[in-house]
């Protein structure tokens, strides 16, 4: 494992964090009274767009080279369409899970769906960018000792931290603090965002700290 690979991973993650920061400040230049809390649904859409765009650009640059067969135009178009379908399936699946765990079924359906969209952005989009629409690869990466690169290690950490952040964000909702960020699903989306950012920061540091112990099957 080369230190340059870890540095490239760190810089990539810093750009992902920067995209979230941009989603907070840039819209305020064009949208009146824009804020994360007051116009939360708008921010969710913008943040999802920014993070997805940055992930697409970055992973196109850092993703390992594929075979000539995979570089054909028809394969790229098919792969892109599959990725879109997988992303939509992820959004609807998360939406159903949230409802089963107590989210409003009809009253706040849009809010719940956009929560599913942002969580899919933090978890499913990186998987699609790095692994493609390949469920076997996904299962391999998230199984024990299944990773083959530092990028997959990072993918594990950021995905898990996003889920943990979303779960922790739900804990304050039933409390009677009467804060504006306790309204569904603001605390959950903010928790997922902080969890995603934490994963982006922690994963390169963890990989660097354990670089001598980490071994990969393709090395």
UniProtKB/Swiss-Prot annotation:
- Give any Gene Ontology cellular component: endoplasmic reticulum membrane
Listed under GO biological process in this entry are: GPI anchor biosynthetic process
- Grouped into one coarse class, the protein's main location is endoplasmic reticulum
Q: Name one Pfam family in it.
A: PIG-F
**Which InterPro entries has this protein been placed in?**
GPI_biosynthesis_protein_Pig-F
Span-the-membrane segments of this chain are 11-31, 42-62, 86-106, 113-133, 155-175, 189-209
Q: Where in the cell is it found?
A: Endoplasmic reticulum membrane
Please give the pathway this protein is involved in. Answer: Glycolipid biosynthesis; glycosylphosphatidylinositol-anchor biosynthesis
Question: Which molecular function term from Gene Ontology is one that the record holds?
Answer: ethanolaminephosphotransferase activity
Q: Quaternary state and partners of this protein? A: Part of the ethanolamine phosphate transferase 3 complex composed by PIGO and PIGF. Part of the ethanolamine phosphate transferase 2 complex with PIGG. PIGF is required to stabilize PIGG and PIGO.
Its function? Stabilizing subunit of the ethanolamine phosphate transferase 3 and ethanolamine phosphate transferase 2 complexes that sequentially transfer an ethanolamine phosphate (EtNP) from a phosphatidylethanolamine (PE) to the 6-OH position of the third alpha-1,2-linked mannose and the second alpha-1,6-linked mannose of the alpha-D-Man-(1->2)-alpha-D-Man-(1->6)-2-PEtn-alpha-D-Man-(1->4)-alpha-D-GlcN-(1->6)-(1-radyl,2-acyl-sn-glycero-3-phospho)-2-acyl-inositol (also termed H6) intermediate to generate a 6-PEtn-alpha-D-Man-(1->2)-6-PEtn-alpha-D-Man-(1->6)-2-PEtn-alpha-D-Man-(1->4)-alpha-D-GlcN-(1->6)-(1-radyl,2-acyl-sn-glycero-3-phospho)-2-acyl-inositol (also termed H8).
Q: Name the associated disease, please.
A: Onychodystrophy, osteodystrophy, impaired intellectual development, and seizures syndrome: An autosomal recessive disorder characterized by global developmental delay, impaired intellectual development, seizures or tonic posturing, dysmorphic facial features, and hypoplastic terminal phalanges and nails.
Q: What family is reported? A: Belongs to the PIGF family.
Q: What is this protein called?
A: GPI ethanolamine phosphate transferase, stabilizing subunit
Question: What organism is listed for this UniProt entry?
Answer: Homo sapiens (Human)
């Amino acid at each position: 494992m080369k230190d340059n690979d870890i540095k490239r991973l760190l810089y990539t993650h810093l750009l992902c964090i920067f995209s979230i920061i941009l989603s907070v400040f840039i819209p305020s230049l064009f949208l009146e009274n824009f804020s994360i809390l007051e116009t939360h649904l708008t921010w969710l859409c913008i943040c999802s767009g920014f993070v997805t765009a940055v992930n697409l650009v970055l992973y196109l640059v850092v993703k390992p080279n594929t075979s000539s067969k995979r570089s054909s135009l028809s394969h790229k178009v098919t792969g892109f369409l599959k990725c879109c379908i997988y992303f939509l399936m992820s959004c609807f699946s998360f939406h159903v899970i949230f409802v089963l765990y107590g989210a409003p079924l009809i009253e706040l359906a849009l809010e719940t769906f956009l929560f599913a969209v942002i969580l899919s952005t933090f978890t499913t989009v990186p998987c699609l960018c790095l692994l493609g629409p390949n469920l076997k690869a996904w299962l391999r990466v998230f199984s024990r000792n299944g990773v083959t690169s530092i990028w997959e290690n990072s993918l594990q950490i950021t995905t898990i931290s996003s889920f943990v952040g979303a779960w922790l964000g739900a804990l304050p909702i039933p409390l009677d603090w009467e804060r504006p960020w306790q309204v569904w699903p603001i605390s959950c989306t903010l928790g997922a965002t902080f969890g995603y950012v934490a994963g982006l920061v922690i994963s390169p540091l963890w990989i660097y700290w354990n670089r001598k112990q980490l071994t990969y099957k393709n090395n």
